[in-house]
C-alpha cells in the first residue's frame, strides 16, 4: 500500500514539475528562443527588467572614471578638469542599485548590441551632456580613422564605421515646436511636433527627456505665447502646458513608430541646484533631507500620467533622486577655464553652473544604466 501511494505521489510530482518546465519553455517559445541556454538568459533578463536601478547608494571606486578629460568630444563647459577644478573625487563614484547589479560600461558589448543600429538622445542641454558622456565612453575602443562626427539640422551624430553604429543627439528641449509668429513673437505650439519629430524616424532606440525648459521663470522663458489648436494663451499653468506637450509627443509615438522596430525610453529630469548650492562641494550628500530633495514632483507626476495612457511600451528611466545626492558633480565656477588669479580668488556667484554635470562624472553612470537597459532587452 505504501509503495502504491509512493508511486502515485512520485507520478504527481513529475506531472507538476513537467508542467512548470513546459510552461517556462512555452513562454520562451513565444519569443522565438529555441536554445535552452539563451532561454535561461532570457528569464534572467526578464527578472532584471523588474529591478529598480534608481534605488541604491553611491560607492567610492578608485577604478573610475572610465575615460579622462582628454576625450576630444567634450564641450569646454563640461571639462571641469581642463578648466582648473583642483579635486577629482567627483569622478570616482559608482552607483550600486539595492536589488540588482549594474555592470561597468563595456564599450565593445554596447557597440556589439547596437551593431548596424542608431540610438538617438533627444532633449535639452542635459541630454547633450549625457550624449557627450556616451560618445566618450565608446570612442576610445575605436581606431581614429574609423569614427567620425556629422551634423544635420538640430542633430549631431557620432559614427562607428566598423560597427555601423551611430550615437546621435537631437536638440528638442520642449519636444513640441517653438516658432516665430506675428511681430517676431515666440510661440510654443503645444499640439505641433513634426518639425522636430521628422528627425526621429528610422531610429532603433530613442531616449527622450523634456522638463527643465517648461519651468523656466518668466524672465528666462523661451516663448511669449502658447498656442493650442487655434487658441493663443499669454499665460498657462506650466504643468498644464507640459501635459499637453507630452500628450502631443505620446500621440506622435503611437501613430508613427513601430514597437517591433523602435524602442522608446524616457529619462526623468536631471536635478539642478539654485544659487551657490553646488559650490565647493567635494563629496556626495550622505542623505536627502526634505530641503535637499529634488523639486520635481509635479513633472514626475505629469510624465507618469501621460505614459500610463499610452499603449506603446515606453521604459521610464529614473535618474532624478540618485543624481540629487551629487551636488559635487556640477561644474559650478569651473564651467570655463580660469586665469591664475581667478583660481586663487574663486567665489560662487550667479555664473555658477549647478545644472549641468562635469565629465567624466555622473552622466557616465546614467549611461551604465542605459547600457544595462539595452543589453538586457528591458525595453
UniProtKB/Swiss-Prot annotation:
Keyword Transmembrane helix assigned: yes
Cell compartments where the protein resides: Membrane
Gene Ontology CC terms: membrane
Keywords: Membrane, Signal-anchor, Transmembrane, Transmembrane helix
Broad class of where this protein is predominantly found: membrane
Biological function: May act as a bridging protein that binds pectin and other cell wall polysaccharides. Probably involved in maintaining esterification of pectins. May be involved in the specific O-acetylation of cell wall polymers.
Family: Belongs to the PC-esterase family. TBL subfamily.
Protein name: Protein trichome birefringence-like 36
Organism, scientific name: Arabidopsis thaliana (Mouse-ear cress)
Gene name in the database record: TBL36
Amino acid at each position: 500500500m505504501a509503495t502504491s501511494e509512493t508511486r502515485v505521489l512520485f507520478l504527481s510530482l513529475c506531472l507538476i514539475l513537467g508542467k512548470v518546465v513546459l510552461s517556462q519553455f512555452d513562454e520562451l517559445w513565444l519569443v522565438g528562443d529555441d536554445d535552452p541556454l539563451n532561454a535561461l538568459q532570457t528569464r534572467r533578463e526578464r527578472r532584471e527588467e523588474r529591478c529598480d536601478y534608481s534605488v541604491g547608494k553611491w560607492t567610492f571606486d578608485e577604478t573610475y572614471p572610465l575615460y579622462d578629460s582628454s576625450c576630444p568630444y567634450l564641450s569646454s563647459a563640461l571639462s571641469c578638469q581642463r578648466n582648473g577644478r583642483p579635486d577629482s573625487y567627483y569622478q570616482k563614484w559608482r552607483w550600486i542599485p539595492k536589488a540588482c547589479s549594474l555592470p561597468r560600461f563595456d564599450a565593445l558589448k554596447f557597440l556589439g548590441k547596437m551593431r548596424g543600429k542608431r540610438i538617438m538622445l533627444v532633449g535639452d542641454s542635459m541630454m547633450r551632456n549625457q550624449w557627450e558622456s556616451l560618445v566618450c565612453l565608446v570612442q576610445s575602443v575605436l581606431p581614429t580613422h574609423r569614427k567620425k562626427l556629422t551634423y544635420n539640422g538640430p542633430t549631431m551624430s557620432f559614427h562607428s564605421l566598423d560597427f555601423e553604429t551611430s550615437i546621435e543627439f537631437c536638440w528638442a528641449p520642449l519636444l513640441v515646436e517653438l516658432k516665430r509668429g506675428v511681430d517676431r513673437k515666440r510661440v510654443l505650439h503645444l499640439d505641433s511636433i513634426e518639425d522636430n519629430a521628422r528627425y526621429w524616424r528610422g531610429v532603433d532606440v530613442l531616449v527622450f527627456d523634456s522638463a527643465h525648459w517648461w519651468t523656466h521663470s518668466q524672465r528666462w522663458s523661451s516663448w511669449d505665447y502658447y498656442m493650442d489648436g487655434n487658441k493663443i494663451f499669454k499665460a498657462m499653468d506650466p504643468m498644464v502646458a507640459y501635459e499637453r506637450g507630452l500628450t502631443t509627443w505620446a500621440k506622435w509615438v503611437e501613430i508613427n513608430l513601430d514597437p517591433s522596430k523602435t524602442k522608446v525610453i524616457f529619462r526623468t529630469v536631471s536635478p539642478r541646484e539654485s544659487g551657490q548650492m553646488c559650490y565647493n562641494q567635494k563629496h556626495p550628500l550622505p542623505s536627502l533631507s526634505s530641503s535637499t530633495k529634488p523639486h520635481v514632483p509635479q513633472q514626475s507626476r505629469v510624465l507618469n500620467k501621460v505614459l500610463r495612457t499610452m499603449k506603446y511600451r515606453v521604459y521610464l528611466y529614473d535618474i532624478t533622486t540618485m543624481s540629487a545626492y551629487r551636488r559635487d558633480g556640477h561644474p559650478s565656477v569651473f564651467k570655463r577655464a580660469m586665469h591664475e588669479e581667478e583660481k586663487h580668488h574663486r567665489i560662487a556667484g550667479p555664473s555658477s553652473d549647478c545644472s549641468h554635470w562635469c565629465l567624466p562624472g555622473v552622466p557616465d553612470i546614467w549611461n551604465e544604466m542605459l547600457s544595462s537597459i539595452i543589453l538586457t532587452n528591458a525595453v
